[in-house]
Amino acid sequence: LHGTGLRPVQRVLKDMGFENVYIEPSQAVPDGNFPTCPYPNPENPDAWKLALELAKEKDADIVLATDPDADRLGVYCKDTKTGEYVTFTGNMSAMLIGEYILSQKSANGTLPENPAFVESIVSTDMGKAIAAAYGVKHIEVLTGFKYIGEQMLKFEKTGCNNYVFGMEESYGCLPGTYARDKDAPAAVCMLCEVAAFYKSQGKTLWDGMIDMYEKYGYYREGISTMTLKGIDGAAQI
C-alpha cells in the first residue's frame, strides 16, 4: 500500500516459484501521501477496493496487502462455494501460518527441543490449542511485538526454549529468529506456501481455516476501532 513492501515481496514470491502474481499498479509506487487510500492499513476495508477489483478480474485465489512499512500483512481469499472474497483477521492468518509450521516441523522431525509459541495477550486462544496439540509451550506476553522479541532474547541467553513462531492479532507475525519485529514479506512467504499446500489438496485457505475450526474449535473474536484525530484527539487519548 504505497510503501516498502513491493520489492521484497515480489522478489521472494519469484524465488519461491510463484508466477501468477498480479500487482495493483496504482498502489505499487511508494508515496507518503497515500493517494488511493488515506488510511493505508490492511485492517481497513477501504484500502482493499482496488486490489479486490483486480482479483476478481484475474480470478485470483488470494489477495495480499502489506502496510507501508511492511510489517503487517492482510489477506482475502476466494471462497469457491460462493465466488466471493472473504477477509481473514490477523488472528486467522497467523493461526494458519503457525499451525502449518508446527505440523510440518512435527511431521518432518525438525521441531526443536523445548519449542515455544509466543503471542500477545490480546490474540486468539486458538494458539493455545494448536501449541498443545504439538507439545509446544505456549507463552503469552504483553501487547507489542517487542515483548515477543524479549522472549526470543531470553531463549537465546538461557537456552530454556526454542522460538518456533510468534504473532499478535494486529496482522503481524514472525516465523524465524532473524529479527525482533513482525515481518510482512516473511509472512507472505509462509501464507503463500500454506495456500499452495491446501491447493494441492483441492482446498482454499478458507477451507483450511474451516478445517482448523473443526479440529481446534471455533474462537469468536471482535475488535472495536476508535479514531481520534489532531490535537483534540491526542488530548482525549
Where are these regions (language model features)?
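Well-ordered alpha-helical segments embedded in enzymatic catalytic cores
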Residues: 46-50, 97, 147
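Short helix/loop capping segments that flank catalytic or ligand/cofactor-binding pockets
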Residues: 5-9, 22, 32-33, 73-75, ...
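Gly/Ser/Thr-rich active-site loops/lids in small-molecule metabolic enzymes
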Residues: 19-23, 83-102, 186-190
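Short, acidic/turn-prone active-site loops that include or flank metal/cofactor-
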Residues: 25-29, 90-94, 142-146
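Phosphate-binding and adjacent anionic-ligand microenvironments
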Residues: 56, 60-62, 84-86, 104-237
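N-terminal small/polar loop signature for handling phosphorylated ligands or for N-terminal nucleophile
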Residues: 11-75
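Short Gly/Thr/Asp-enriched flexible loops that form oxyanion-binding sites at enzyme active sites
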Residues: 9, 71-91, 127
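Gly/Ser/Thr-rich loops at beta-strand to alpha-helix junctions
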Residues: 1-7, 70-72, 122-125, 230-232
